[in-house]
Amino acid sequence: MKPFKTSWADEVEADYVDGLPPCSEYIEGDYKYVTEYKFNDDGKKVKVVRTFKIEKQVVSKAVARRRGWVKFGDSRLDKPGPNSQTTMASEEIFMLFMGSKEFEQTHETQMDAGKNIAKCRICNGEHWSVNCPYKGTSMDSKTLMESKANAAAAAALNDPSKPGKYVPPFMKDGAGGAGGKGRERDDSSAVRISNLSESMTETDLEELVKKIGPHTKMYLAREKNTGLCKGFAYVHFKFRQDAAAAIEILNGHGYDHLILCVEWSKPQP
Protein backbone atom coordinates (compact mmCIF):
# COMPACT_ATOMS: atom_id res chain seq x y z
CA MET A 1 0.00 0.00 0.00
CA LYS A 2 1.42 3.33 -1.00
CA PRO A 3 1.80 5.98 1.76
CA PHE A 4 -0.63 8.84 1.76
CA LYS A 5 0.97 12.04 0.46
CA THR A 6 -0.11 15.57 1.32
CA SER A 7 0.76 18.86 -0.34
CA TRP A 8 3.37 21.17 1.13
CA ALA A 9 0.70 23.83 1.74
CA ASP A 10 -1.26 21.43 3.96
CA GLU A 11 1.87 20.53 5.94
CA VAL A 12 2.77 24.21 6.54
CA GLU A 13 -0.79 25.07 7.55
CA ALA A 14 -0.89 22.09 9.95
CA ASP A 15 2.21 23.41 11.77
CA TYR A 16 0.65 26.84 12.32
CA VAL A 17 -1.25 27.54 15.52
CA ASP A 18 -4.17 29.90 15.10
CA GLY A 19 -2.87 30.75 11.66
CA LEU A 20 0.53 31.92 13.01
CA PRO A 21 3.91 30.39 12.16
CA PRO A 22 5.75 28.78 15.09
CA CYS A 23 8.39 30.67 17.02
CA SER A 24 12.01 30.14 16.09
CA GLU A 25 15.26 30.98 17.81
CA TYR A 26 18.94 30.60 17.13
CA ILE A 27 22.18 31.57 18.86
CA GLU A 28 25.01 33.36 17.13
CA GLY A 29 28.02 34.16 19.26
CA ASP A 30 26.95 35.91 22.46
CA TYR A 31 23.53 36.83 21.07
CA LYS A 32 20.26 34.93 20.93
CA TYR A 33 17.64 35.83 18.31
CA VAL A 34 13.98 34.92 18.87
CA THR A 35 11.40 35.33 16.10
CA GLU A 36 7.70 35.39 16.96
CA TYR A 37 4.48 36.08 15.09
CA LYS A 38 1.34 37.64 16.48
CA PHE A 39 -1.68 39.73 15.58
CA ASN A 40 -1.68 43.43 16.37
CA ASP A 41 -4.64 45.51 17.50
CA ASP A 42 -5.82 45.90 13.90
CA GLY A 43 -5.92 42.13 13.42
CA LYS A 44 -2.92 42.10 11.12
CA LYS A 45 -0.18 39.51 11.36
CA VAL A 46 3.17 40.99 12.48
CA LYS A 47 6.63 39.55 12.93
CA VAL A 48 8.57 40.32 16.11
CA VAL A 49 12.31 39.68 16.33
CA ARG A 50 13.91 39.98 19.77
CA THR A 51 17.63 39.99 20.40
CA PHE A 52 19.11 38.82 23.71
CA LYS A 53 22.69 39.16 24.83
CA ILE A 54 23.96 36.09 26.63
CA GLU A 55 25.87 36.90 29.81
CA LYS A 56 27.27 34.68 32.50
CA GLN A 57 26.65 35.88 36.03
CA VAL A 58 27.57 34.60 39.44
CA VAL A 59 24.38 34.51 41.49
CA SER A 60 23.54 33.29 44.94
CA LYS A 61 22.38 29.75 45.56
CA ALA A 62 18.84 30.94 46.28
CA VAL A 63 18.56 32.66 42.88
CA ALA A 64 19.93 29.61 41.06
CA ARG A 65 17.48 27.42 42.94
CA ARG A 66 14.51 29.59 41.96
CA ARG A 67 15.47 29.43 38.30
CA GLY A 68 15.23 25.63 38.46
CA TRP A 69 11.68 25.57 39.81
CA VAL A 70 9.16 23.59 37.77
CA LYS A 71 6.77 25.87 35.89
CA PHE A 72 3.02 25.35 35.98
CA GLY A 73 -0.14 26.46 34.22
CA ASP A 74 0.25 27.84 30.71
CA SER A 75 4.04 27.90 31.20
CA ARG A 76 4.54 24.30 32.33
CA LEU A 77 6.18 23.36 29.01
CA ASP A 78 8.29 26.54 28.73
CA LYS A 79 12.05 26.53 28.94
CA PRO A 80 13.90 28.24 31.80
CA GLY A 81 13.54 31.99 31.58
CA PRO A 82 10.61 34.33 30.94
CA ASN A 83 8.10 33.74 28.15
CA SER A 84 6.74 36.91 26.56
CA GLN A 85 3.33 35.33 26.01
CA THR A 86 2.77 34.52 29.68
CA THR A 87 5.26 36.77 31.50
CA MET A 88 5.55 40.55 31.47
CA ALA A 89 9.02 41.71 32.52
CA SER A 90 9.04 44.83 34.68
CA GLU A 91 11.92 47.12 35.54
CA GLU A 92 15.01 45.14 36.41
CA ILE A 93 16.10 45.45 40.01
CA PHE A 94 19.79 44.99 40.73
CA MET A 95 20.72 43.47 44.08
CA LEU A 96 24.13 44.03 45.60
CA PHE A 97 25.35 41.33 47.95
CA MET A 98 27.92 42.60 50.43
CA GLY A 99 30.18 40.72 52.76
CA SER A 100 30.43 41.39 56.47
CA LYS A 101 33.46 43.67 56.08
CA GLU A 102 31.76 45.84 53.45
CA PHE A 103 28.62 46.06 55.60
CA GLU A 104 30.63 47.27 58.59
CA GLN A 105 32.33 49.96 56.49
CA THR A 106 28.96 51.16 55.14
CA HIS A 107 27.47 51.15 58.63
CA GLU A 108 30.38 53.20 60.00
CA THR A 109 29.98 55.73 57.17
CA GLN A 110 26.30 56.18 58.03
CA MET A 111 27.16 56.62 61.69
CA ASP A 112 29.80 59.23 60.84
CA ALA A 113 27.23 61.21 58.84
CA GLY A 114 24.95 61.54 61.87
CA LYS A 115 27.53 61.83 64.64
CA ASN A 116 27.11 65.61 64.93
CA ILE A 117 23.57 65.15 66.24
CA ALA A 118 24.78 64.62 69.81
CA LYS A 119 26.52 67.44 71.66
CA CYS A 120 27.86 67.21 75.18
CA ARG A 121 26.85 69.93 77.66
CA ILE A 122 30.03 69.41 79.68
CA CYS A 123 32.85 69.61 77.11
CA ASN A 124 30.86 70.46 73.92
CA GLY A 125 32.07 67.22 72.36
CA GLU A 126 30.22 65.18 69.74
CA HIS A 127 28.73 62.69 72.21
CA TRP A 128 25.98 62.53 74.81
CA SER A 129 26.60 64.13 78.20
CA VAL A 130 26.02 60.83 80.03
CA ASN A 131 28.97 59.30 78.12
CA CYS A 132 31.33 62.25 78.63
CA PRO A 133 34.80 61.17 79.80
CA TYR A 134 35.14 64.49 81.70
CA LYS A 135 32.00 63.91 83.78
CA GLY A 136 32.79 64.63 87.42
CA THR A 137 36.12 66.31 86.62
CA SER A 138 37.08 69.98 86.60
CA MET A 139 35.50 70.41 83.16
CA ASP A 140 32.07 69.34 84.45
CA SER A 141 29.63 72.27 84.65
CA LYS A 142 28.50 71.23 88.15
CA THR A 143 32.06 70.98 89.38
CA LEU A 144 32.91 74.28 87.70
CA MET A 145 29.95 75.96 89.40
CA GLU A 146 31.06 74.65 92.79
CA SER A 147 34.61 75.89 92.15
CA LYS A 148 33.31 79.36 91.27
CA ALA A 149 31.14 79.36 94.39
CA ASN A 150 34.08 78.47 96.62
CA ALA A 151 36.31 81.06 94.96
CA ALA A 152 33.68 83.79 95.30
CA ALA A 153 33.06 82.90 98.94
CA ALA A 154 36.78 82.97 99.72
CA ALA A 155 37.14 86.36 98.04
CA ALA A 156 34.24 87.75 100.05
CA LEU A 157 35.76 86.56 103.33
CA ASN A 158 39.37 87.49 102.63
CA ASP A 159 38.66 90.97 101.28
CA PRO A 160 35.68 92.45 103.20
CA SER A 161 36.82 96.06 102.62
CA LYS A 162 36.79 95.89 98.83
CA PRO A 163 34.82 98.87 97.46
CA GLY A 164 31.56 98.19 95.71
CA LYS A 165 30.87 95.10 97.80
CA TYR A 166 28.31 94.93 100.58
CA VAL A 167 29.88 94.21 103.97
CA PRO A 168 27.59 93.41 106.91
CA PRO A 169 28.10 95.40 110.11
CA PHE A 170 29.61 92.51 112.05
CA MET A 171 32.48 92.29 109.52
CA LYS A 172 33.36 95.99 109.59
CA ASP A 173 36.34 97.28 111.54
CA GLY A 174 35.53 98.25 115.10
CA ALA A 175 32.15 96.54 115.06
CA GLY A 176 30.97 94.49 117.99
CA GLY A 177 30.18 90.82 117.94
CA ALA A 178 26.45 91.43 117.57
CA GLY A 179 24.70 92.65 114.47
CA GLY A 180 23.21 96.07 113.89
CA LYS A 181 20.98 97.43 116.61
CA GLY A 182 17.22 97.39 116.13
CA ARG A 183 17.28 94.60 113.57
CA GLU A 184 15.05 91.64 114.30
CA ARG A 185 16.29 89.47 111.42
CA ASP A 186 19.58 88.89 109.63
CA ASP A 187 19.44 89.68 105.89
CA SER A 188 23.20 89.53 105.40
CA SER A 189 22.92 86.26 103.47
CA ALA A 190 19.80 87.15 101.45
CA VAL A 191 19.87 87.89 97.72
CA ARG A 192 17.26 89.36 95.40
CA ILE A 193 16.76 87.66 92.02
CA SER A 194 14.90 89.76 89.46
CA ASN A 195 13.90 89.57 85.79
CA LEU A 196 12.19 86.21 86.26
CA SER A 197 9.53 84.98 83.84
CA GLU A 198 5.82 84.87 84.71
CA SER A 199 5.82 81.07 84.61
CA MET A 200 8.45 80.80 87.37
CA THR A 201 7.50 78.50 90.27
CA GLU A 202 8.96 77.73 93.67
CA THR A 203 10.21 74.41 92.33
CA ASP A 204 12.05 76.14 89.49
CA LEU A 205 13.55 78.63 91.93
CA GLU A 206 14.78 75.85 94.20
CA GLU A 207 16.31 74.00 91.23
CA LEU A 208 18.10 77.20 90.28
CA VAL A 209 19.81 77.85 93.63
CA LYS A 210 20.11 74.45 95.33
CA LYS A 211 23.39 73.62 93.53
CA ILE A 212 25.06 76.70 95.00
CA GLY A 213 24.45 76.02 98.67
CA PRO A 214 21.86 75.36 101.40
CA HIS A 215 19.19 78.00 101.99
CA THR A 216 16.86 78.67 104.91
CA LYS A 217 13.88 80.15 103.09
CA MET A 218 12.68 81.48 99.75
CA TYR A 219 10.01 83.94 98.70
CA LEU A 220 8.61 84.16 95.16
CA ALA A 221 6.49 87.27 94.59
CA ARG A 222 3.17 86.49 92.87
CA GLU A 223 0.20 88.48 91.59
CA LYS A 224 -2.83 88.18 93.87
CA ASN A 225 -5.38 87.78 91.07
CA THR A 226 -3.54 85.70 88.47
CA GLY A 227 -1.03 83.88 90.66
CA LEU A 228 1.74 84.58 88.15
CA CYS A 229 5.24 85.54 89.16
CA LYS A 230 5.85 89.28 89.53
CA GLY A 231 9.38 88.89 88.21
CA PHE A 232 11.46 88.81 91.39
CA ALA A 233 12.21 86.56 94.36
CA TYR A 234 14.25 86.50 97.58
CA VAL A 235 16.49 83.66 98.71
CA HIS A 236 18.03 83.46 102.19
CA PHE A 237 21.12 81.29 102.16
CA LYS A 238 22.43 79.60 105.27
CA PHE A 239 25.94 80.93 104.73
CA ARG A 240 26.99 84.30 103.40
CA GLN A 241 29.68 82.81 101.16
CA ASP A 242 26.96 80.86 99.36
CA ALA A 243 25.02 84.08 98.82
CA ALA A 244 28.13 85.73 97.38
CA ALA A 245 28.63 82.74 95.12
CA ALA A 246 25.01 83.00 93.92
CA ILE A 247 25.56 86.61 92.90
CA GLU A 248 28.82 85.74 91.16
CA ILE A 249 27.34 82.82 89.22
CA LEU A 250 23.71 83.74 88.53
CA ASN A 251 24.02 87.47 87.86
CA GLY A 252 23.85 87.84 84.07
CA HIS A 253 22.99 84.16 83.67
CA GLY A 254 20.44 83.30 80.98
CA TYR A 255 17.37 81.50 82.28
CA ASP A 256 14.08 80.86 80.45
CA HIS A 257 15.06 83.26 77.62
CA LEU A 258 15.74 86.07 80.14
CA ILE A 259 18.92 87.48 81.71
CA LEU A 260 18.82 87.24 85.49
CA CYS A 261 19.80 90.11 87.76
CA VAL A 262 21.04 88.95 91.18
CA GLU A 263 22.10 91.38 93.92
CA TRP A 264 22.26 91.67 97.68
CA SER A 265 18.91 92.13 99.33
CA LYS A 266 18.50 95.59 100.83
CA PRO A 267 17.82 95.60 104.59
CA GLN A 268 14.12 95.88 105.34
CA PRO A 269 13.07 98.36 108.03
Swiss-Prot record:
* GO cellular component terms, semicolon-separated: eukaryotic 43S preinitiation complex; eukaryotic 48S preinitiation complex; eukaryotic translation initiation factor 3 complex
Return the InterPro entries for the record: eIF3_g, eIF3g_N, eIF3G_RRM, Nucleotide-bd_a/b_plait_sf, RBD_domain_sf, RRM_dom
Record-linked CDD domains = eIF3G, RRM_eIF3G_like
Q: Name one GO molecular function term.
A: RNA binding
Single Gene Ontology BP annotation = formation of cytoplasmic translation initiation complex
Where in the cell? Cytoplasm
Q: Name one Pfam family in it.
A: eIF3g
The SS bond pairs are: none
- Membrane spanning residue stretches: none
Where does the source fall among the domains of life?
Eukaryota
Give the coiled coil ranges: none
**Which ranges carry the RRM domain?**
189-267
State the HAMAP family in the record: eIF3g
Subunit (UniProt): Component of the eukaryotic translation initiation factor 3 (eIF-3) complex. The eIF-3 complex interacts with pix.
Summarizing the function annotation, the protein's role is:
RNA-binding component of the eukaryotic translation initiation factor 3 (eIF-3) complex, which is involved in protein synthesis of a specialized repertoire of mRNAs and, together with other initiation factors, stimulates binding of mRNA and methionyl-tRNAi to the 40S ribosome. The eIF-3 complex specifically targets and initiates translation of a subset of mRNAs involved in cell proliferation. This subunit can bind 18S rRNA.
* Family statement drawn from the similarity comment of this UniProt entry: Belongs to the eIF-3 subunit G family.
Question: Can you say what this protein is called?
Answer: Eukaryotic translation initiation factor 3 subunit G-2
Source organism (scientific name): Drosophila ananassae
